[in-house]
Amino acid sequence: MMKDEYNSQECMVCSAPADGLHYGAISCRSCNAFFRRTVVEKAEYRCKHTNTCLIDPDGRCACRSCRFTKCIEAGMKIGAVQPRRDPTGSQKERRKRAGGVGEMMSMNNSPLERNGNSFSSDGPTSNSFIVDAIRTDYGFATPRRISTDYSNSPDRYRKYVKIELDDEPIPSTSSAPEKQSCQSSPNDDEQQEFNHLVYAFGEHQRMMQLSFSTFEQFLDEHSNGPKLRRMDPLDVSKLSAVELTGLLYWIEKQQPYGELPVEDRSSLLKRYSVRKLSLDHFYSASKHPEYCARGEFVMNNFTFVPADRTGFELPDDDPHQIQAKREHCRTFAPTFNRFWKNVIRPFVLMKVNDAEVVFLHIMLLWSVTNNEHVTEDTRKVMKQRRDWAMNRLFDWYNEHGTSDPPLRFGQMILLLGEIELICDMHCQDFQVAKLFEFCDMSKFWYETLCYAPCNTNVLKFDPNLLENLKRFTAISVMENNGGLRPFVKTEIKQDPVLYSSPEVIAPESCYNDYQTVDIPVDCNPHTEPVSMDPNLANIDPAVLVFNAHMLPSVMAPLPDDADYHRPQLYHTQSEEVMT
């Protein structure tokens, strides 16, 4: 029977259209590849059920044990499988040489952690300087092993996605010689888990997009492609609902997140939420280079934020409020400029794909920067997952023929650090915006998760940021209302507890009892400095922002307050001057 005559028959293993007679049985190309790899690699599988799993075109990857058993029952002969032919030398000897290099690398490079991302040792050899740098700094890649986390995960994890991993171009055993490959195809359960995540991420992004579409838009998109429109303030409500659902769906996919203690899950959810949304937005924007060139930020809901808008506009804002927000937005220019220059533009130039974004998501969720918020046992799990993600991405590069995988991998690590930093800067910006009532997120979930205290603790960035802003605001208000006289410099004794938070108080040995402060003097520029009322000398101007009832004690009276009695703030020059 000729090969073409088998096309009308079904595979005796999975019932898919047959490709020919392979190893003694009529089978499809996928089952042919699966059977051959299992025999060559001497793989052993174990069914998690009763060894009666259904093997069909949709579910043939669900249970490898039952699939291999059915191959044998269909008549495939193990003895008919030939070992890989290597024209450059013995495959066995080459593996020994590769193993020797790996052992030398593991002895010379101990695993280190840097910026929250750790590598193990033993990776592909290369003369590239970046590979050597990565190995030296991180200690690269461990040998693959079977993942007990994934193999023991509930069956519901497998049912969400259907992806065939065995459909690769393996030549038929009945015709042309085998195509040689220097790299064995990664096909263990760990790589399958990563491929499932990549597939699920694409489905997840598409489902979020469809949540914003009407059926008219859906039909028009298939005919004319997606149409983008300017973002409207009313879009925020719908966007928040869809993004919350997407966040919970995606984090549930991450193994073994569901098995962690509830306190650790809560902390990781809050820490990851702002990073997940930021990365999704960066990735969505990078898919539209023409909009990026104009400085227009494309969102996942088929809208874009124009260059002359901030994205914080509310439905009832008038033109003056919109202009004011635009002016205030300059405060956040460092953050905006950084993510445009250091994240979105590289995403566009590199044409970052779903697999790389999945890798970044995994690294952000299990980042070492989250260690202080979880238990010791969870920290160990997080390190394992970071190592797992790095190995999986490198295998994915090799499997898909990526040009210069070590260089590409190094670029992704650099992007990871930038995204972490930008998310921290964004959370600090939110604190400033909230202080000046620049935006109100209280009715959305963003403030509960994304801007939770574990994300908005800015003391490690600028301990005096909020304090300085409050002081500046209070003093500016008082100056504008005539409540303060011109300033001269003098020294008064201060209580450090009054001017600093407990976290930033210096040791007593380093504290200077006398510090330079501004003291108002009389309006006559030639008069000597006058002293302040001792009861008010140490009042923090920031207190006035939150205690409006104290303003009459420190501000000049208005014209209609002429008879209003208030305590004297300034004494005459004959009184004692504080120095």
Swiss-Prot record:
DNA-binding region: 8-83
Pfam family membership, one: zf-C4
One biological process term in Gene Ontology: regulation of transcription by RNA polymerase II
InterPro entries documented for this protein: HNF4-like_DBD, NHR-like_dom_sf, Nucl_hrmn_rcpt_lig-bd, Znf_hrmn_rcpt, Znf_NHR/GATA
Function: Orphan nuclear receptor.
Family indicated by similarity: Belongs to the nuclear hormone receptor family.
Protein name (database record): Nuclear hormone receptor family member nhr-71
Segments forming domain NR LBD: 189-452
Keywords assigned: DNA-binding, Metal-binding, Nucleus, Receptor, Transcription, Transcription regulation, Zinc, Zinc-finger
Record region (Disordered): 82-124, 168-189
An example Gene Ontology CC term for this record: nucleus
Compositionally biased intervals (Polar residues): 106-124, 171-186
